[in-house]
Amino acid sequence: METTPIKPTAADETTPSAEQSSNRSSTAKPMSASLREKLKRSRHSFKSPLSVVKRLKIEDDTEPQPSQQGEEEKHGVKDDRDSNVTETDVNRNDMKLQRDSNHTAELPSQQCEALRKAVKERTETLRRLKMVKMYRKKNDLNELQRLTDKWRSCAQSVLYELQRELATGGKQASLSQLIDSFGINDKLLHFDRTEEDFTDT
């Protein structure tokens, strides 16, 4: 009569392992204090590689990319060129203004003096014309002419009389000397020096 083999049950299979674990736990020695302190230190000093990778990734992200650096350098060069061009234009304008001012300051002093003299003469002529215009408005020209002729006749008579009174040693003073001593214009008296006499007498 054949006998069938008996298969071991799960309880039978687990029984030795349980026994082994119980034996191990019973045979395990308690951990010493120095060993526990070393384990604590090793835990604190241990660094996970994931944290190192994360830190490296963040640092890489913060660093500028080569393309960004190239663009920034291009913009920087362009800004420097623009600033250099602006400074060059400003310097050229300053030099031009300085040359113009120097050219103006180099005007000859003789030319300035001639201009001042011309302005003074024109001002005096304008003043006299205004006076003539004013007298013409206020007075009659015929009356003025009559008074001028009367004054000339009186002046000529006085000069003749002075010439006779001032004669010394039978020698009379010339009319030219008398007119020059009084500072009278020959044209006002109608006096001719070549003839040494008045033209309207």
UniProtKB/Swiss-Prot annotation:
Residues 1-111 are annotated as: Disordered. InterPro entries: SFR1, SFR1/Mei5. Residues 109-131 form a coiled coil. GO terms for biological process: double-strand break repair via homologous recombination; positive regulation of DNA-templated transcription. Pfam families: Mei5 (PF10376). Its main location: nucleus. The keyword Transcription applies. Residues 12-29 have a biased composition (Polar residues). It is found in: Nucleus. Keywords: Coiled coil, DNA damage, DNA repair, Nucleus, Transcription, Transcription regulation. It comes from the Eukaryota. One of its GO terms (molecular function) is transcription coactivator activity. One of its GO terms (cellular component) is nucleus. Gene3D superfamilies: 6.10.140.1020. The keyword Lyase does not apply. Residues 71-103 have a biased composition (Basic and acidic residues). Belongs to the SFR1/MEI5 family. Component of the swi5-sfr1 complex, a complex required for double-strand break repair via homologous recombination. Component of the swi5-sfr1 complex. This is Swi5-dependent recombination DNA repair protein 1 homolog. It comes from Danio rerio. The gene is sfr1.
